Amino acid sequence: MDKVYMAIKKCIVSDYPYDLDWNDEVLYKLFIDTYNAIIEEHSHINNSYYSDDEGGKLMLNYLDHYAIFCFRFAKRLHKEGLIQIADATYYSMRIRCSIDLYYTSNIGECFMPVHALGTIMDSHAIYGRHFKIYDGCHIGPYSIVGKEPKEWVHPTFGDYVTMLAHSTVYGNSVIGNNVIISAGTNIINEEIPDNCIVSGSSPNLVFQKLRISNKSIRKE
């Protein structure tokens, strides 16, 4: 585990353009806590990249996993008041994984970014458990011109939602549970029901019943 910690430290420190006040005594414990928490989460994902018969996996040379670790670690650092290291961890994730996911975001357990290059996730949106997102996606507020940021409205996602490549969700959108958002779909200020596949662009969305549940990804 010491080698893994040192590898992560090397990545974060070398990526950041400024000197860091890195305290190994404090940060090693937070690293271990974060690492073990992710292993536990991954043990409940029915996917060979995330778990096997021996339990959860965290392969930090696999950039999807690196993004997950950086997000969870930065969030923990922020909670502990270690803002500079949280910023550096976020910075490392952003340049190595090409995903913009700020550590103040609220994401449920078993988050799965899948080759999520060029994806931007709204840090004020609410994301449920087993949220899965692919490349080129964008999530954010809508119609913000002339409004203060505190007036912006952000999307909410239920559990077991998958956003396929180049799909977008904006504004006062509420996405139900067990939903697949098809590639290229554009959702603006819409309420999406549970158990469906949605495609098209607002206001002309098309809905199909989801016959194979996203919940099959869950392993108890």
Q: PLM features: what roles do these ranges have?
A:
Residues 1-94, 213-220:
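Terminal amphipathic alpha-helical/low-complexity segments used for targeting or macromolecular assembly
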Residues 94-210:
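Structural signal for interior beta-strand "rungs" in well-ordered beta-sheet cores
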